[in-house]
Structures are given as C-alpha cells and as structure tokens.
C-alpha cells in the first residue's frame, strides 16, 4: 500500500507509489478546524450534555454577539431556520408580499413559501447584489404593499445597505439580511447581518466557519430574538407541564455543535484574513487578462467567502469548469437566478438581465482557507489555458 503524507496546513494528500504523486481533490470551500474544537467536544461528552442547548451553545451565541456587535443571537440548526424565524417574527401573514434578491441560493427564499407569502424577485446591479433602483420599481409594481425585503449579501460581499435601508424605511418595509455567506463581512463598520431588523448566518460545512450544519439569527431587537427562541423550541410555555398556545419548530442547535462553533469563532479573524488574501492572490495572478471580479461597494469590506469572476464570453466558464474538474479541482457556476427557476414561474420579477448575464459568464473558484499559494497558482494556470 502506498504511504500517505497528510499536510494539516493545506489538506493536500500526496500518495507516493512507484514515483507517482497524486494530489487530493481541491474543494471549493472545505471545513478548516482551528484546533480547540475536539477539546471542547470532549468536555461536552464528559458533561453528558449532548442534547440541544447547553453551556457551549450559550458561549457560541455570546461569541457571535461580541463579534457582530449585536444585542441578541440565537443558535439554530440551519441558516434557513434563522431566515424562517426572521420572517415569522416579522409578522407576515398568508398572501403578504415579500421582496427578495433573485441572484441568490434557493434557501434565501424558501421561507417565503413556508409562510405562504408572495415572492417578488429583484435583479442585481453592478455590485452583483440587489439593485436599489430596481427595488424602488419592484415596490411600485408589487400587487400589494410589501411587508419584508430579504436582501442577500452575495458571496460574502455587502449589498448597498444605506440606500436599501433608506428606501425600505420610507415604505415601512422590514429588512431581513441573508448573511449566510457573509459572517466576517462589514459595511461602514457594521457587521453584515446586524444592519437591518435582523440577519441570518449559516455554519454549513462550506461556510467561512462551520459547525457541520447550523445557523444563527442575530438582531439588535432583543424582543424579536426572544420570540424566535420561544418558537424554536416548539413554542413551549414556561410551565412545569407541556403547554402550547402557538405552534413552533424544532430548530435549536446541539451542545456538541455549539462546542465546534466556539472553537471556530476563535479563528474567524484569521479565516477572514486568509479569504481576502486568497482573493488578492487571484486578482494579482489574473492581472492583464480579460476577467472581471466581483467588486466591493463603497464602505464595504466583505469576507470574500468565494472568489468569483466573470469571463468576457458567454459560456466560457463551462470549458474552464470541465478542465478544472479533470484536474480534480472543484469550481462552480454562479447561482442560477431564482426568476429562471420553475418554482418561481408566474412570480413578479423586476429584472434587467444583469443576473442572467452573470450566470452565463461567471465562475466560483476554490477559496478554502487552507489552500496553499501554489494550489492557487495551479488553478489560475488551468483557467488561463482554457479561456
């Protein structure tokens, strides 16, 4: 059997067999443990408190509150759960209109269906995020007065929150931030997710930090967070016996995963620093070529969760993705806009072709925080050879 050499720094596995060296697959954004997670998990097992809730869930929530500067945080089993509770706590009813970014992942908008609301989809502008201009148009065209806007901070980069929040404030529309990809990103000194009424974070396995699966609702509205906490534990009344006056959900995070989260929060600043370094390396290596990177809005400092770019020609990304895959390197197209998905057939979409154009020309490149600079150079070499 060949002997394997494991590099904890790069997760690159080299197998030496009769002079051959094979590199492990390079993933888009794999987990990267900080080192203390196992110790914290061990303490959870020693306490036998492995169920939802517990000391490490509390510590995880406190760490996120401290980092984001928000007054309330609720650890949950998914970012989608956080978005669902945010929408439920906003007071929407059957048939209410909820505005949302079209250039996003389906999980951003699934809660609209959970609450039997009516989606109205809004296109992006040059920032790749939701267009304030089209937001105004969508409000005018909406079949009824919108109650909520769910705005996505795409790929960890800030949307134009000053303009968006001002428009929504003037119209009496609550702003929920889908910051699932954006923990560690800021806009004019404020943490993404902590600017609107509330925000949702994700700790899925591919995010900048992970708890394997998980999410968090953050807000400066402590009453909203308290209501969400109540709903997340089956809406059980605080009595000796089980009493229920409303319906709730089983959305809480386990103490085991909370322990992972505590360890991950300890290394979040380093993870953000490395993500931004990776972007800068890509940017430098592609200098002089005909590609366009996702920009940063004025006042924004995103986490650069994934390095994304556009090629000049439509569908050029498909050849590149195929070439990278043959080299055992993962890459992906950009999100397919929601207004092109069959589930949204018939929904009002205020679009101008921006996200469709980006979808036809864009690619997500490997951006794992444990990638070596040499691996990034290898990725760029293959891309250049195939555009």
Where are these regions (language model features)?
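Active-site phosphate-binding strand-loop segment of PLP-dependent enzymes
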Residues: 127-211, 216-218, 223
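Phosphate-binding glycine-rich loop
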Residues: 53-97, 111-115, 121, 190
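Short beta-strand->loop structural element characteristic of the AMP-binding/adenylate-forming
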Residues: 100, 118-127, 332
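N-terminal "arm"/small-domain region of PLP-dependent enzymes with the aminotransferase-like
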Residues: 2-51, 366
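PLP-dependent aminotransferase class I/II
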Residues: 5, 16, 58-62, 70-71, ...
């Amino acid at each position: 059997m060949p002997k394997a050499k494991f590099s904890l720094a790069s997760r690159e596995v080299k197998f030496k067999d009769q002079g051959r060296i094979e590199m492990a697959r390079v993933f888009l954004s794999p987990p990267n443990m900080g080192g203390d997670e196992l110790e914290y998990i061990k303490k959870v097992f020693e306490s036998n408190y492995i169920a939802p809730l517990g000391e490490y869930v509390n510590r995880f929530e406190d760490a996120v509150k401290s980092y984001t500067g928000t007054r309330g945080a609720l650890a949950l089993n998914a970012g989608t759960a956080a978005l669902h509770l945010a929408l439920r706590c906003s007071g929407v009813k059957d048939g209410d209109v909820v505005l949302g970014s079209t250039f996003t992942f389906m999980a951003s908008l699934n809660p609209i269906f959970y609450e039997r609301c009516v989606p109205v989809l809004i296109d992006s502008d040059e920032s790749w995020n939701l267009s304030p201009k089209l937001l105004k148009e969508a409000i005018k065209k909406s079949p009824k007065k919108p109650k909520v806007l769910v705005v996505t901070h795409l790929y960890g980069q800030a949307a134009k929150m000053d303009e968006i929040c001002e428009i929504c404030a003037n119209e009496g529309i609550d702003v929920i931030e889908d910051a699932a990809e954006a923990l560690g990103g800021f806009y004019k000194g404020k943490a993404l997710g902590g600017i609107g009424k509330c925000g949702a974070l994700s700790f899925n396995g591919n995010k900048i930090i992970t708890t394997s699966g998980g999410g968090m609702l953050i807000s400066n509205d402590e009453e909203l967070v308290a209501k969400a906490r109540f709903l997340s534990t089956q809406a059980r009344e605080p009595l000796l016996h089980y009493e229920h006056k409303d319906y709730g959900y089983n959305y809480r995070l386990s103490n085991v995963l909370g322990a992972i989260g505590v360890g991950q929060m300890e290394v979040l600043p380093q993870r953000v620093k490395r993500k931004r370094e990776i972007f800068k390396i890509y940017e430098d290596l592609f200098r002089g070529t005909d590609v366009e990177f996702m920009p940063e809005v004025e006042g924004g400092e995103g986490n650069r969760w994934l390095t994304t770019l556009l090629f000049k020609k439509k569908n050029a990304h498909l050849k590149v993705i195929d070439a990278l895959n043959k080299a055992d390197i993962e890459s992906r197209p950009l999100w397919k806009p929601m207004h092109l998905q069959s589930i949204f057939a018939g929904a009002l979409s205020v679009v101008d072709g921006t996200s469709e154009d980006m979808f036809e020309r864009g690619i997500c490149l490997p951006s794992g925080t444990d990638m070596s600079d040499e691996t990034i150079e290898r990725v760029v070499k293959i891309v250049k050879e195939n555009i």
